[in-house]
Amino acid sequence: MGNLFFLLIFIHKLNNMVRNLSEKASILGQYMAEIRDVNIQNDPIRFRTNLERIAEIIAYEISKTVTYHEIEVKTPLGISREFRLTDDPVLITILRAGLAMHNGLLRTFDRCDSAFVSAYREHTSPEEFKIHVEYLAAPNLDNRIWIISDPMLATGRSMVNVYNALLEYGKPKKVYVAVSIATPQAIELVQKSLPPSAEIWTGAIDAELTAESYIVPGLGDAGDLAYGVKV
């Protein structure tokens, strides 16, 4: 009851830089239910597909907030006036768990460049860990829109470390963080560490972290569910 009350208070205080897409009922809820459900999530194809679907929904919602310019398109019967993105974002994902969400984002923003970053936890004790960023492949990121995806925003430390590593490739014009599940603790850390204009888009917000920094109720290990148990 205490965690639920804390979550309700936190959600009430959210500013417009945090978008919780579970606040209103939509088909997103079905995909969220399936990635969480222990009777469904062990099908890796279905799990990856649902992460892709969640990312597509987030991408569509983000697409409403970026800048467009009007163009003329010649059809077989005449001229149509349409809108085209003024600045294609760069889609950045955290390996390996973020790959499925990256595919969903790329399906929506299909003309975009991509960047890939490895970030993992090294546990020094059951409750303590360090974040390592060892691999980064990216285009020029200076003055560009970044969309950084990862299924789980648990502590926020990986996201912050990845953001800081990406700064070697340039400073962003705008940052979007796209995740399936986030915690209040992670949201607060990311908001303190990233630019004030950074937006966090999440499929849900869960109130609790275990002593090992796993989200409750969460869904388990997204990378293992999507791509197999690592050793």
Features from the language model and the residues they span:
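PRPP-associated nucleotide enzymes
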Residues: F5, I9-V231
